[in-house]
Amino acid sequence: MSELNYEELGLKVGLEIHQQLNTSHKLFCNCSTNLKEDYKLTLERYLRPALSELGEVDVAALFEWKKGKKYVYRIPITTSCLVEADEEPPHAINEEALKIALAIAIALNSNIVDEIYVMRKIVIDGSNTTGFQRTAIVALGGMLKDEGVTIQTIAVEEDAARKIDEGTDQVTYSLDRLGIPLIEISTGPDIRSPEQAERVALKIGQLLRMTGKVKRGIGTIRQDLNISIKGGTKIEIKGVQKLELIPDIVRYEAMRQFNLLKIKEELNKRGVSKNLILSNFVVKDLTELFKNTNSKIIKSGIEKGGLVYGIRAYKLKGILGWELIPKKRRFGTEIADYVRALAELGGLFHSDELPNYGITEEEINKVREALNATTEDGFILIVGERERLDKAVEVIRDRILLAFDGIPKETRGALDDGTTKFLRPQPSSARMYPETDIPPRRIDEKLLEDAKKFVPESPESKMKRYITLGLSEELAKEIIRDPRLDLFEELVNKYSPKVSPVVIASTITNTLKYVKSKGGDISKINEEDIEELIKSVYENKISKDSISEILLEYTTNKNVELKDVIRKYEALPTEELEKIIDDVISSNLDEIRKRKDKAVNLIMSKVMSKVKGRAEGKVILELIKSRLKNVME
C-alpha cells in the first residue's frame, strides 16, 4: 500500500481510551467487578429511544430501535443485583473510581470540575438494560506534553453488558460486566500520523496502568478513533482492542476517505447527479432469469424461497468496483455493509466483479437487457426474502446517493485486518440528559488529597530511578517506551534485587527482539510467560542466561508449553557442570597449551555450546579459570 502524504491530506485523528478500573465494586452498586458465568435466571427487554433534554431523538438510537430486536440478559448471582436489572435506583457513585480518575486528571494537568454531575447517554443497542449509559465528566482540558496532544475530557462511566450471542431477532447479554467502572480519556484531533496515533494510545495506556488501579487483559481496554481528512467529515471507529492495529486502521481509513472523495469527483466529471440516479433507478425481480443458474449463493437463496432483485446503477460502471483500500475494500463493499447492517441481508453482487461466483457472461447480458442498462451503467444483484429485499433496495439507493456527498457521517467497527465496516449512523448531540437518581458530588480537598496517592510517576522521574537501579540510559529509555512498562515495575517489585532489574528490562525489550529476529513468533509470549521465566530465575530453577534460548525454543515450536521448555533448561548441578568443563579441557589440552592465557575464550565457547544457558556465564568463567590455572601449572 503506497503511503499517503498525511500533511497534504489534512489528516486529523483523535482518540478515546476506555479503560476498566480495578475497584472493589461497581460504579453504582456494591457488586463485584469480576466476570462470572454463574447465572440461573434471565430477563427480557425491548428498548425504545427517549427524548434528550433538547426534546430530540438521537439518530443512532432510532437506528437501533428500528431493528426491533429482543434483548435477553443473563443474571449472574454474584456479580449483579437489582441495579443492573434496572429494578432499583443506582447507589451513590463509587468514590474509589472517582479518586483514580482524578489522579489521571492531575497527571495530565487537566482542569478538575467543581461538581460531578452524572448524565444519561442514550444507548438502545441492548448493551444496557436501562436504554442509557451513565457517564460523568471529571475534568476538562490537559495535555500529553511530549506529543503536543490536547486532552478534551476525562470521564467516568459504567461499562456495557457483555454480549454473549446475536441472532436475527434476539441478542443475549450477561450482566456481569454491566456497571464496571470505566475511565474515558478523549484527546483533541491533534494527531497527525498513524504512528503518532499508536504512540499516544500507548502513552495514555501506560499512564493508566502505572496507577496500579486498572484491570489488565483482553477486553479491559478499548481504543476508539475519530479520523478525518480535508474535505471530509469526522468518522468514529469503535472497538480497537489491539494497540498494534491502530497505525493500519488510521492508514486504511485515511485511504478509504481519500478514495470516497475521488469517487465524488468522478461522479461530477461524468455529469451524474442525485436526480439522475433517482430518475434512472430501475429495480426488477430477476428470479426467473436465474432459475437454472450455477451460482451457489443465488441457487441456495432461491431454493429457500427467496427472490433475486436486479438494480440498475446509472452511469456507475467502474464506480462499484472502485478500490477504496487496495485488495481489501471497494465501493461495492461499502454498499454491502449498509445492506448487511440495515436490511440484514448478505448475498450482494455488482457488475464490476462479474462474471464470477458462478454467474456467467450470458446471465450478465440478460440482466443488462432486463434492466435497460447501457455499457456505461453498472448493476447490483441481491438475493433474499421479499420484505428484506424491499428494505435493501432503499438502502442501496440511499448509499449510492450518499456518494455525491463524499464521506458519509458514520460510526464504523474495527476489523482484525485493520479495515473497518459500517455499524450505524453517528450519534447526534441529542443523546444526553441528566441522571435524576444520583445527586451531584462536590470535589472537596479530602477527595483530591486521596486521589494524589494514585498519581503516576512522571517519565523524567522514572528515568532517574531506573538509572539508579542499574539500567543504562538507553535501556531505561527503551523500557519507558515499552507497552509492558507496568509489567517491568511489577516484576522489579516482586523479584529484585535477587533478579537484577537489568535482566528484567532486557528480557522484556532486547530478548524479545532477539527472539523475533531468529524467527520466533513473539505474539505467543504473554505477560504471564515473562513472569514465569523471571520467577524461575528467582527460584534458581534456571539461569538468566537461558532465558533467550527458552523463549526461542518456545516460540518456534507450535505444540510446546513454556513449562516443558523451562524444565528442559533447568540449571545444571555444580558437579555436572564441573564434569562438562573438565571433559572440554581434557579434549583440548594441546590447543590450551598453544594458546596459553587466550585459551579461556576457546574453552568458554565450547562449554557454553554444551551447557546451552543452563548455567550462569559468570559461574562458568570462574570454574574454567580455576581449572585452566591447574592445567597451565
Curated annotation (Swiss-Prot):
One of its GO terms (molecular function) is glutaminyl-tRNA synthase (glutamine-hydrolyzing) activity. It comes from the Archaea. It holds the Pfam family GatB_Yqey. One of its GO terms (cellular component) is cytoplasm. Keywords: ATP-binding, Ligase, Nucleotide-binding, Protein biosynthesis. SUPFAM superfamilies: GAD domain-like (SSF55261), GatB/YqeY motif (SSF89095), Glutamine synthetase/guanido kinase (SSF55931). Its EC number is 6.3.5.-. GO terms for biological process: glutaminyl-tRNAGln biosynthesis via transamidation; translation. It catalyses: L-glutamyl-tRNA(Gln) + L-glutamine + ATP + H2O = L-glutaminyl-tRNA(Gln) + L-glutamate + ADP + phosphate + H(+). PROSITE patterns: GATB. InterPro entries: Asn/Gln-tRNA_amidoTrfase_suB/E, Asn/Gln-tRNA_Trfase_suB/E_cat, Asn/Gln_amidotransferase, Asn/Gln_tRNA_amidoTrase-B-like, GAD-like_sf, GAD_dom, GatB_C_1, GatB_Yqey_C_2. It is an enzyme of class 6 (ligase). The keyword Chaperone does not apply. Heterodimer of GatD and GatE. Belongs to the GatB/GatE family. GatE subfamily. Allows the formation of correctly charged Gln-tRNA(Gln) through the transamidation of misacylated Glu-tRNA(Gln) in organisms which lack glutaminyl-tRNA synthetase. The reaction takes place in the presence of glutamine and ATP through an activated gamma-phospho-Glu-tRNA(Gln). The GatDE system is specific for glutamate and does not act on aspartate. This is Glutamyl-tRNA(Gln) amidotransferase subunit E. It comes from Saccharolobus islandicus (strain M.16.27) (Sulfolobus islandicus). The gene is gatE.
